Regions:
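Extended catalytic cores of very large enzyme megasubunits
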Residues: 1-124
Length: 124
């Protein structure tokens, strides 16, 4: 079953061009690899969480999330941000903009962590 709603959460606008930190900042992933921070990845992730919560963001809400995240990243005054810190920043932005999506975002993160722990228990 395909609906228009499934495609509504995807948007062509690149917020990474409009909202940038004031310097190059890298996100340090769980495996230790580093990726240049781009707020467009945040918008993609929160869009998926909104979809799971059966809602979507307005353009203004997306811009508010971007501005919040970039402001917080700039405030840290570091060149590298561990992914758990980035998740917390994004979650805080969502709490301000659309709390139901913050819950979806948090629940999905917890689900992934629980799944990894379960696999670790089975494998070791």
């Amino acid at each position: 079953m395909s609906s228009n709603f499934e495609h509504d959460h995807e948007e062509n606008e690149d917020y990474g061009k409009q909202f940038r930190p004031d310097r190059e900042i890298y996100v340090v992933k769980k495996d230790g690899s580093k990726e240049l921070f781009n707020v467009q990845k945040v918008i993609s992730a929160v869009g998926k969480s909104a979809y799971r919560a059966l809602t979507k963001f307005t353009k203004e809400e997306k811009e508010n999330i971007c501005q919040y995240v970039v402001d917080k990243v700039n405030e840290l005054e570091v060149d590298e941000i561990p992914i758990p810190i980035m998740h917390n920043i994004v979650e805080s932005a969502l709490e301000q903009v659309k709390p139901i999506v913050a819950k979806s975002y948090r629940d999905y993160r917890n689900y992934k962590q629980d799944f990894v722990r379960m696999l670790d228990c089975l494998l070791y």
